[in-house]
Amino acid sequence: ISEGFIITDPFLLYKPKKVVNTITYLTSKELFKLENHKFSQKRLEQVRDMFVFCCYTGLPYQEMSILTQKHIVKKFDGKLWIDMFRQKTKRQFSIPLLPKAISIIEKYQDDKRLLPVVSNQKFNSYLKEIAEIIGIEKKLTHHIARKTFATTVLLYNDVPIEVVSELLGHSKISTTQDHYAKVVQRKVSEQISTLSRKLDK
């Protein structure tokens, strides 16, 4: 343009394609396998329990590590919820406690904190051991628990994307849609297939 060879910028209307993130999470079979394995070492059992707890709450490591009894409240529905502030954004959030998460809290309720205290580095190191013992061929990190909560626990059980977005603490639903686009598409495909079979009858 500056040299006078062309009048308009040919890239002005060009919009790059969005890159769909590939997310790693545990399938329902892998999660079941993890939940039911008997560990001989207490440290691995504790980290497994903490990981599973996050699979059913979606808590990031920062929130999990400071969770105390004051964060557990009985709400309008008579059920227990986690009520606290995100360390990253300082936004308040609430997550209803599913039965499996409650059972893990009850297991460790004698502790000063609701869950054992393990550093983030050791946590991920122990997860690597756990994956090798159980035979999960994925690089297990704490972050995968949050992804598992969003996908295997919520989306694959037909929880609406709006609710998933709220429970993950996303400020915009578009953030959730971008992160979990492939999962949502797969669910839409499954539901349309089910609808097609019903309409064919």
Regions found by a protein language model. Give the residues of each.
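Basic, Lys/Arg- and aromatic-enriched nucleic-acid-binding interface segment
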Residues: 6-61, 79
